[in-house]
Amino acid sequence: MKISILGAGGWGTTLAILLHNNGHEVTLWEYKSNYAKLLSKNRTNEIYLPGIQIPTELIITHNLNEAVNKKHVLVLAVPSQFLRSVIHQIDFSEIKNTILLSVAKGIENNSLMTMSQMLKDEIAELDENQIAVLSGPSHAEEVSRKIPTAVVAASKNHETSKLIQVAFMTPYFRVYSSTDILGVELGGSFKNVIAIGAGIIDGAKYGDNTKAAIMTRGVAEISRLGLAMGALPETFAGLSGMGDLIVTCMSRHSRNRFVGEQIGAGKKLKDILKSMEMVAEGVQTSKSASQLANKFNVETPITTEVYRILFEDKDPIKATLDLMTRDMKTE
């Protein structure tokens, strides 16, 4: 198949290489022209994926029309808060027979839409059969080195999710299929907020008990909100829910956990973000998740406290105490 990846960050580059090695004709689009030229020349992505060679046959371009035209699949690897602006530049006539696969993990601010909902909102002519997502515990740093990984491809149309499953499957990258596209997206997005909370626990030098509590109660509130929004409960116990939450809360590769850790150690959010090359999706998602919780009248105490720490400058120690001294509940 002819497949383009929009977004040459670590994950976009990793998936481009994986798909190329799987026998597909792959184009990788980078929005900065100078960086696209650098990638083409050096055949490494030293900022976002150092040490990994990009095959010479893999096409790298800054031209969006070239990347989009006459492709079977467009992989959308642009951060969630910037994806709409990229999609807005695409004419439906160029993608009327193309599957759009989102691999971003976030909820759009203001609209409170998942990426699949935003795609349909931005391009009304899109059929739901053309929209899919890929999510799960999958750090680019490991997938690019062929470390065994399992993820989920989801679409409302089973044939679409099956096509993505077949396109991406390798001996080291196992893909399951699902039709619960909403649940897969919500799990992948909301867990980033919980991972910031887990990082705060690390940075504040609390223990394993505290972190385990944040993670398990985090799954509980993610599931509550997801179910209220119409997702399936079993999705949150799977790879895109529990699986992704575990790896994002625990891994040294996790940008969201890193942000939380730095805040727990006393640093300010603006200084942390300024020092990072890559995007920590959970920062902005904490806004959207808090608003969705209010909209659907669902209690999400961890998400609420993470939001207050990030945007209302609440002391992490005070936030932890407030969580621990809430009214008694049954599990």
Report residues per predicted region.
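Rossmann-like NAD(P)(H) cofactor-binding subdomain of soluble oxidoreductases
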Residues: 54, 60-146, 164
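NAD(P)+-binding Rossmann beta1-loop-alpha1 motif at the extreme N-terminus of oxidoreductases
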Residues: 1-52, 62
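Internal alpha-helical scaffold of NAD(P)-dependent oxidoreductase catalytic cores
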Residues: 82, 93, 118, 122-130, ...
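NAD(P)-dependent Rossmann-like dehydrogenase/reductase catalytic/cofactor-binding core
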Residues: 198, 227-237, 241-331
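Electropositive phosphate-/nucleotide-binding environments in soluble metabolic enzymes
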Residues: 9, 13, 33, 61, ...
